């Protein structure tokens, strides 16, 4: 592929195309990857398809204005995003330590983007071109459009539209609204006065300027000074986050009014097909070849996006505030055509890594009502259980998988983007389940039960543990019948709001009973735009306004994390202290149900734990043996949990990186 098939990144590229000036210059905190898994690629190609000239400035040096001028002043304006991931999450771990690698940067090098990139870039653009139109979007802008709690500053920050000084904010996936914005700019409108488009935010000087039906939220001053008010404000945002029934929201910021128009409708199937058929080069720009490319492309190069939106609505997930709860999907033909294209890549080895989306086995709205009435205001589709009106049907997805796996040159089609096992179990037809196990598991199936404590699962918005048990038993039954050795990898989370030390110990006991120790544990990470983050900050559940326990101290968070890896000798002292603190000395000693040995009982060469660390035996034990292990519960655990089994029937020690939780 020749370099000039990418959009211009320098003046020479513009000259080669015969351009004197760009209509738009898109500034991004990621390296330039022209693949539809990256927002920069989609927005730039959608605008190109609408007839606009778009140039790209990727990862500019923000310490001067020079890089921001290298394509000249755009005719209509600058578009700015902070990359595919919020820059603060990209830079820092949950313990606020600097990460070692940036997968969206050449060589994985850190320091090529600033903290709060959207704000920094907008300031530099204003320095270079004072009165140019600036439109911000992407995940950073979308999830920070309201006044929001910021974990890294540990305070409530203003809307990013205020802090950045941009003229307009587009939120969500934004294909529809960005073209409409472009058309108005092209007609001569000032960006500040484009005010009626769904999925956009603007700043008004007074309430008299707002003509749409709207709700006035508590002001920035009010939510930043009172946590109960913050929680009440978030509840309104949460309820109105719907493109059908949602209303415009207004929030005062120091005498100005941030106006958040209702969300844009999700793209139809035909619209999605057109977006994904645009002439993406499906790789990084050739300028990165000398540095070995960009690692982020490896996760998506041989994967196919099937759908958008998620009906799961997990409390800790930001999908609700970005893509929304209404699921839409590409047509089978669109996906099959792209799969055929992938088979022609020189480095394709016959394996499609994924056909999915936020949740792989969602292909349509949860029920027929959603497209006309919107998602229910006071109910979740799948929590605490699956709604009776939810249409559970895997037939279309199954037919798609069959078509792709039959294509010449394709050896295997895997599913890696996450499956809702409760949705699978609710399907009365188990054909999909059988074919999933037979054809679409790469040795390990990743699912996200997250926890076992009923109390924690309630706050997470996750299904009851018994549903996972049923799924797990059926998975291993089918696996055994097929004569395969396949495992389940559970995503587990520590320190989620509502998780007390006894809840973490309950999870540790389950891990003990199945002889499984995760290599990695995810601490809850309070990121903007989620229900769980609001719980973390306010210590209230916004949906009920009841108090929520928050494991906030470093000591307790370390204890909860260590309990999930109690077999690790390095964690012995922390686990010991946690058990003593919780009054669970019954789990310290030499008994079969003890998590760790007593400090006085170590013999030469003995592990601090009473249990083997797993290893090959733990990975390869058959499911029948696992079933018997699940029945061996301590009397204390039974008393806590009642008769409901919420165990994890696991066979693998490895935990994969970088996948979204479902």
From Swiss-Prot:
Residues 633-644 have a biased composition (Basic residues). SMART domains: Elp3. Residues 618-632 have a biased composition (Basic and acidic residues). Belongs to the UPF0313 family. Gene3D superfamilies: tm_1862 like domain. The keyword Cell cycle does not apply. It comes from the Bacteria. Its cofactor is [4Fe-4S] cluster. Keywords: 4Fe-4S, Iron, Iron-sulfur, Metal-binding, S-adenosyl-L-methionine. The keyword Aminoacyl-tRNA synthetase does not apply. Residues 296-567 form the Radical SAM core domain. This is UPF0313 protein CPR_1216. One of its GO terms (molecular function) is 4 iron, 4 sulfur cluster binding. It comes from Clostridium perfringens (strain SM101 / Type A).
């Amino acid at each position: 592929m020749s370099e000039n098939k990418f959009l211009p990144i320098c003046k020479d590229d513009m000259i080669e195309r015969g351009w004197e000036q760009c209509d738009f210059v898109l500034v991004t905190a990621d390296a330039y990857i022209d693949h539809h898994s990256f927002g920069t690629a989609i927005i730039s190609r959608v605008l190109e398809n609408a007839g606009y000239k778009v140039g790209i400035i990727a990862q500019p040096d923000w310490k001067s204005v020079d890089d921001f001028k290298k394509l000249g002043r755009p005719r209509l304006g600058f578009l700015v995003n902070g990359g595919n991931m919020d820059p603060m999450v990209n830079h820092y771990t949950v313990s606020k330590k600097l990460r070692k690698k940036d997968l969206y940067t050449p060589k994985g090098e850190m320091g090529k983007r600033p903290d709060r990139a959207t704000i920094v870039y907008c300031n530099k653009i204003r320095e270079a071109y004072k009165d140019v139109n600036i439109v911000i979007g992407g995940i950073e802008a979308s999830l920070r459009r309201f006044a929001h709690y910021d974990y890294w500053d540990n305070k409530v920050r203003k809307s990013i539209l205020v802090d950045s000084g941009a003229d307009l904010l587009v939120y969500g996936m934004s294909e529809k609204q960005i073209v409409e914005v472009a058309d108005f700019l092209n007609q001569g409108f000032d960006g500040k006065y484009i005010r009626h488009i769904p999925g956009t935010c603007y700043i008004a000087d007074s309430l008299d300027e707002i003509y749409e039906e709207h709700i006035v939220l508590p002001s920035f001053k009010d939510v930043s000074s009172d946590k109960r008010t913050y929680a009440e404000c978030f509840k309104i945002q949460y309820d109105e986050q719907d493109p059908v029934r949602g209303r415009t929201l207004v929030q005062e910021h120091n005498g100005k009014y941030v106006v958040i128009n209702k969300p844009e409708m999700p793209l139809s199937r035909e619209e999605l097909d057109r977006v994904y058929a645009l002439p993406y080069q499906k790789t990084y720009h050739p300028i990165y070849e000398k540095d070995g490319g960009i690692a982020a492309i490896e996760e998506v190069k041989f994967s196919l996006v099937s759908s958008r939106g998620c009906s799961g609505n997990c409390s800790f997930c930001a999908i609700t505030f970005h893509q929304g709860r209404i699921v839409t999907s590409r047509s089978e033909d669109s996906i099959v055509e792209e799969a055929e294209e992938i088979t022609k890549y020189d480095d394709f080895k016959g394996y499609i890594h994924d056909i999915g989306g936020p949740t792989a086995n969602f292909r349509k709205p949860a029920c027929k009502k959603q497209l006309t009435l919107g998602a229910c205001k006071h109910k979740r589709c799948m929590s605490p259980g699956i709604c009776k009106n939810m249409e559970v049907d895997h037939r279309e997805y199954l037919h798609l998988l069959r078509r792709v796996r039959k294509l010449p040159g394709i050896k295997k089609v895997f599913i890696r983007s996450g499956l809702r096992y409760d949705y699978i179990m609710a399907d009365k037809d188990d054909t999909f389940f059988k074919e999933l196990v037979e054809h679409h598991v790469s040795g390990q199936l990743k699912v996200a039960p997250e926890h076992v404590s009923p109390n924690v699962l309630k706050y997470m918005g996750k299904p009851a543990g018994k549903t996972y048990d049923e799924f797990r038993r059926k998975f291993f039954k089918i696996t055994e019948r097929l004569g395969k050795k396949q495992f389940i990898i559970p995503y587990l989370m520590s320190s989620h709001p509502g998780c007390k030390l006894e809840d973490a110990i309950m999870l540790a006991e389950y891990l003990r009973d199945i002889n499984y120790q995760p290599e990695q544990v995810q601490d809850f990470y309070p990121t903007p735009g989620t229900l769980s983050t609001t719980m973390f900050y306010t210590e209230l559940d916004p949906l009920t306004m009841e108090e929520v326990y928050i494991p906030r101290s470093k000591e307790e968070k370390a204890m909860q994390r260590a309990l999930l890896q109690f077999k690790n000798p390095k964690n012995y002292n922390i686990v010991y202290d946690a058990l003593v603190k919780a009054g669970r000395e019954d789990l310290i000693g030499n008994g079969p149900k003890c998590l760790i040995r007593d400090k006085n009982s170590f013999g030469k060469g003995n592990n601090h734990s009473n249990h083997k660390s797993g290893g090959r035996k733990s990975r390869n034990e058959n499911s029948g043996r696992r079933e018997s292990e699940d029945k061996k519960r301590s009397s204390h655990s039974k008393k806590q949990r009642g008769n409901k089994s919420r165990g994890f029937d696991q066979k693998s020690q490895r935990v994969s990186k970088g996948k979204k939780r479902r």
